[in-house]
Each structure stands twice: as structure tokens, then as C-alpha cells.
Amino acid sequence: MRLLGYVLCCTVAFGAPPVRFAAHTVATGLKGGYQVVAVDLNHDGKTDLVALASGMSELVWYENPGWERHVIADHLSEMINLAAWDMDGDGIPEIVLASGFAMNANKSAGIVSVLQHNGDPRQMWRVREIDRLPASHRLRWADIDGSGHKVVISQPLTNAAAVTPQDRLHTPMVMYRPGAWKRETISSAEEGVVHGIYIVDWDGDGRDEILSAGFSGIHLYKLSRDGVWNRTEIAKGDPAPWPKCGSSDVAVGHVGERRFVAAIEPWHGNQVAIYRESGGVWQRHVIDDGIADGHTIWTADFNGDGRDEVVAGYRGKGVNIYYAQDGEGAEWRKTVLDSDMPAAACAIADLNGDGRPDIACIGSSTANLKWYENLGPARQ
């Protein structure tokens, strides 16, 4: 793996040193492991792990701390994404699920369902289909109006008429309001693949915005006070010609008070990019161009120095953590968390209650789920 020249490979000069992690296996046999979500599913104050595996017919969760396996629902096919949030206030989240996925939209059922428990989340949940939108691919809950009530954001991979993902058609972003569950279009401005979405209160006004990452680059979607969605380009992503252009997954972090945007680029790409704003323009810096089939990116302050690290997982295979080397986020150092984890997805949460953020990742070709215990900064 080649790191670009401005990435430092020496001892961390600023902030706390890199963190030590201890790896723990939660589960194996998760064929086509694709997503892990960290959420308290049984209202006991401990964060559990939901594992979605596209090659399985069961959606399962593992109960913290012993990681006992429970089946949420079965007889499912081609599951691709889920999101969890307690919409009725009973302390146990509801789950929205996208299934029936195929890479080519004309072969994708695009089933969107709502899953609710029947009183005991350790038993089977009710599954209610609410929509079919071909190529439904990413789901997130978002409080778009600051009311405290969230809606479901659904991002298909491509236009429903696309024969291949590379077709240059407009790709919609839609939403569902709990209760009515009627599909509402947010935008159809994107072209080609839109692979990732990220929910963030971008401007600190108490309302969530949406970041999208796709062939068209990285864009911010914000609902105005008069109910109109506004779309703003943050960056174009990889400048290569179509369809090797744009972005794939996106996350937001901070180095001190300074915000940055982290991305995997292009689609399922080989690059980890950091964007920093200067004079209204988001400047692109590729800090690693040696990953393979990049598929997940997150930020968190693992060592408590006030500077978020970047976690990048790739199915090619590996999980890396990048540490800022200065107070501006201009220089970064890479450490390898796990060279044997073909991470399709990771999640960040305090899984053992010690106040430190831990990492969980699910492997695609290895069909396993692991969590990485944050042991604190290494001694120097």
C-alpha cells in the first residue's frame, strides 16, 4: 500500500499517541456480511450489534455483553441496508430495512420495510412492507425540521431504469414520514451511482442535513424553512472521467474547532480523501491511494485529544485508522487496525461502557463480525 508523500509515518508529533485496540470475534457464518449497526435493542442501557448479511435470509442481532444471537426476522432476501430509531418512544427502536437488492436496477425489487418488536425484542419482529423502489440501497433516520421527530431518508443506488450502474440517468433521493409511509421525492439531481449518505447537523441549527456521495461528487441537502430542499455542491470528488469519477462514502469530523469531510473515492475506490474548507472552497487532499474496494468511512476521537480520527474499511481487505498530525488536519498518519478484515461496514460506539469509543466491523468475504476494544493511547 502506497501512502502519498505528505502523510507522516513517524511518531505522532501533536496530540495523544495512537490507540491500542483488542480484537474480539462476535460471530462467524454471516454470509455476504454487509452492514453492522450499533444500537440498544432491548432497552438495558448497553449497545447491541445488528448484523445484516446479504447472503442470509435472517436478520440477526447480538446482545451485549455476552453477544447472544437473536433473530429479528427471517425469509428475507438480498438485504442491503437498515437504520434503527425509536419512533414510538417505548425505548426500543424500530428498524427500516431495504431488501430485494440487485446491482442492476431492472432486476431489483427494492423492498423497503418497517420492522417492529412484539413486546420482547429477543423474539421475532413484525415486518411490514411500505414501498418498492428499485435499487433501494441506503436508509437513514433524520430530524430534518428540528421537531425531534425523524423521517426515513432512502437513497437508491441508481435510477430505477438503469440497466447498469454506469448508466448516466438521474438518481432520486426520497423520504418517508412515519405513519403515512408515503414516498416523497427530495431530489433527482444526482447522476449515476449514489453510494453513500450521511446525516449531520451541518450548520448547528438543530436540524439535520444530508450529505450524499456519488458519481456527481459530494452534495449537501438542506430543507428550508418554507419546505423546499436546497442542494449545494461540497466537492466533485475524484476528477477522473465518468464513470471513475466522484465519491463513494462520506463522513464529517473535526480537528479541534476545524471541520473536515472524509471520503472514500471514487465508487468502491482506492482513495481516502480529506476535504478542508478555505475561502469557501473545499480543498481535496488524498491521504491514501492504496486501499482496494473501499466501502465504509467514519470519524471519532479515539484517543481523547480533541481531534477526530478517520476509520476506513475496504473489502480488499483491511481497516485503517488515520491520525491528524497537526492542528489543521493537513497531515495524517496511518495505522492498520486489522489487515484480515474485508470490512463492508463499520460502526462506532462505546460497547463496554468505559467511556471510550470502540469499533465494530463486518466482513464480506470472511463472513464475520468483530469488535475492537479501545484500550486507550499506547505508551510512548
Named regions from a protein language model:
Residues M1-R2, R122:
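Universal eukaryotic N-terminal targeting presequences
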Residues L3-A13:
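Sec-dependent N-terminal signal peptides
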Residues G15-Q380:
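Beta-propeller-forming repeat regions
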